């Protein structure tokens, strides 16, 4: 059961549309879906909103500490409300996944992501859920920092937005703790193919109109 949805990014208008802020885009979209307003919460060093689903409090959080101090925000809220690491989902940009795809993962290393690195440190564990939104890789390691801090091309942004829309459908399953169902929704990168037109018996292959 997910009780805390965290989106990673950097605060400020100059970073708003950059690849590194894909996690913020996801939380913004979820807040719109759930008709919530993210408001500054100084105690948790971020923008936050709380709702009630099935009698359970669920939080949305966007740390405003800059990426490499994200754990300060996540840790503060999680500790105060006694939210366990396994009840946290962190949504972040992922270099090793192409735009338009997303991957749900539990645990593991921070893989060099500075936001995850600090969350690991503040929670004292890597045993929390991550939703990895693909932003693609520049192809050269030396270009990674420049890549994540730039805006994606129009078609890349559209692909990322498509992934956000699709993965938001998994939110109810994530809250309910139905992780297999959530994984199926998130990892289905394309809608199912439409069924072929129905044919009337013996019509010689012409699609039926009724």
UniProtKB/Swiss-Prot annotation:
Annotated region Disordered: the residues are 186-210
What residue range is the signal peptide? none
Residue sites binding tRNA per the record: 15, 66, 68, 114
| E.C. number | 3.1.1.29
Q: Name one GO biological process term.
A: rescue of stalled ribosome
Localization: Cytoplasm
- Can you provide one Gene Ontology molecular function annotated for this UniProt record? peptidyl-tRNA hydrolase activity
- The main place the protein resides is cytoplasm
> According to the lineage, what is the superkingdom?
Bacteria
Q: What are the UniProt keywords, alphabetically?
A: Cytoplasm, Hydrolase, RNA-binding, tRNA-binding
UniProt keyword Hydrolase, yes or no = yes
Q: What residues correspond to the site Discriminates between blocked and unblocked aminoacyl-tRNA?
A: 10
In chain numbering, the residues marked as site (Stabilizes the basic form of H active site to accept a proton) are: 93
**What PROSITE patterns does this protein map onto?**
PEPT_TRNA_HYDROL_2
One Pfam family, short name: Pept_tRNA_hydro
Please give the catalytic activity noted in the UniProt record: an N-acyl-L-alpha-aminoacyl-tRNA + H2O = an N-acyl-L-amino acid + a tRNA + H(+)
Is Chaperone among this UniProt entry's keywords? Answer: no
- Give the positions the UniProt entry annotates as the active site: 20 (proton acceptor)
**CC per GO annotation:** cytoplasm
Family membership, please give it.
Belongs to the PTH family.
Outline what the protein does. Hydrolyzes ribosome-free peptidyl-tRNAs (with 1 or more amino acids incorporated), which drop off the ribosome during protein synthesis, or as a result of ribosome stalling.
| Subunit and interaction comment | Monomer.
PANTHER family reported in the protein's UniProt record: PEPTIDYL-TRNA HYDROLASE
> What's the protein name?
Peptidyl-tRNA hydrolase
């Amino acid at each position: 059961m997910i009780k805390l949805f965290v989106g990673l990014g950097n605060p400020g208008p100059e970073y708003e549309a950059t690849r590194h802020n894909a996690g913020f885009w996801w939380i913004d979209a979820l807040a719109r879906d759930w008709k919530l307003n993210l408001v500054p919460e100084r105690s948790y060093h971020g923008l936050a909103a709380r709702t009630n689903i099935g009698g359970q409090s669920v939080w949305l959080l966007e740390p405003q500490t800059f990426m490499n101090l994200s754990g300060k925000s996540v840790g503060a809220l999680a500790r105060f409300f006694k939210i366990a690491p396994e009840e946290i989902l962190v949504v972040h940009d992922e270099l090793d996944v192409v735009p338009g795809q997303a991957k749900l993962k539990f645990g593991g290393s921070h893989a060099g992501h500075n936001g995850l690195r600090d969350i690991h440190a503040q929670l004292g564990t890597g045993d929390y859920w991550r939703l990895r939104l693909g932003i693609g890789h520049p192809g050269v390691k030396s270009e990674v920092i420049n890549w994540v801090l730039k805006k994606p091309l129009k078609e890349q942004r559209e692909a990322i937005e498509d992934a956000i829309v699709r993965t938001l459908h998994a939110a109810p399953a994530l809250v309910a703790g139905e992780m297999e169902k959530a994984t199926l929704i998130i990892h289905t990168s394309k809608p199912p193919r439409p069924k072929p037109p129905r044919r009337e018996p013996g019509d010689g292959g012409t699609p039926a109109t009724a």
